[in-house]
Curated annotation (Swiss-Prot):
Subcellular location: Cytoplasm
Protein name: Peptidase T
Species this protein is from: Pectobacterium carotovorum subsp. carotovorum (strain PC1)
Gene of this entry: pepT
Family that this chain belongs to: Belongs to the peptidase M20B family.
An example Gene Ontology CC term for this record: cytosol
The enzyme's E.C. designation: 3.4.11.4
Catalytic reactions on record: Release of the N-terminal residue from a tripeptide
Any GO BP annotation: peptide catabolic process
Role: Cleaves the N-terminal amino acid of tripeptides.
Entry's cofactor comment: Binds 2 Zn(2+) ions per subunit.
Keywords (A to Z) from UniProt: Aminopeptidase, Cytoplasm, Hydrolase, Metal-binding, Metalloprotease, Protease, Zinc
Amino acid sequence: MDKLLDRFLNYVSFDTQSKSGVRQVPSTDGQLKLARALQQELLELGFEQVVLSKQGCLMATLPANVAWPVPAIGFISHMDTSPDFSGKNVNPQILENYRGGDIALGVGDEVLSPVMFPVLHQLLGHTLITTDGKTLLGADDKAGIAEIMTALVRLKKSQLPHGDIRVAFTPDEEIGKGAQFFDVKAFNAQWAYTVDGGGVGELEYENFNAASVQVKIVGNNVHPGSAKGVMVNALTLASRYHQQVPESQSPEQTDGYQGFYHLHSMKGSVERADLHYIVRDFDRNGFEQRKQTMLDIAEKVGAGLHPDCYIEVTITDTYYNMREQVEQHPHIIALAQQAMRDCDIEPNMKPIRGGTDGAHLSFQGLPCPNLFTGGYNYHGKHEFVTLEGMEKAVSVIMRIAELTALRAKP
């Protein structure tokens, strides 16, 4: 199990799909099964302070191998996969020396095409690990777990100087609960990095401000033959509500630093309709304005309704942009940039169009930017990762550990 690829293939065999709307953490038993397997692996490899909490958060330490004081740093990845697509019976395909063109995913009609995913043009000659078209792959974030584990093992075997290295594998990141029961004090690191990014070179310390918006619409159902002046169709109101949401500010029409409104799900009948939106914005003022827009639309569409019929909007903030926290510690970013350059990788600073455990942890006093994994197209059947990208992530983790020790040397 010393090989990076073997580790990754083992981890993706665990079904760890998280589940929204569940109060317990972790939300699924499969995550605990992987946590226990990782706990056993860490113990067998001789790591110290291996602790698994009842909420499924696993922590461990690789002790320092130098005599001088070095800041303790951490590396964190999450064990769950997205609820958006099946993570059961993952059957990875390994394609060595990719030569271009479409890649068949399994035996059906599904393909991974450079027409839809142009990044493939940059990966000629690489070893690609894909799905069989029936599930997601789980590189998000089991590639990160495999990379951290492999980096620790190699550091332990090598003579490279390093201080205390703390690692954590968390549950339920995909549903925003990954850091809810994370014990920052017990983790005892001065700063950390999540290994949960995308393509090689990605280094991220800005993420969305995020909120969940539940829109409850209550109508009045009567026989349609005698409905005039009496029926209030909740589905019609739902349609009117959504038509007021700025269409040009949807996920499929935005990128970079642009925020969005996203209708995630809807269900309903004449009597009642429920819409679930997520709103995202990098700027805090823009974020607050988006939430106000959702309230304003409800007031506009619901104007003049009978008191028994109404539109109710419930907004819950999910996480905030960690930039304001991480920018107070510029050496953390500079260190990661230097480590990448030392590994012949050009850092690609970009905003996270999503969230990570690092966002929550940064606000809990553990500054925590995000490193790449070498994976692409997360949360669906077109997800893939390159073995070369994973190896580079391992090298960067090791170099960050080494640089931290060298910079602290008297």
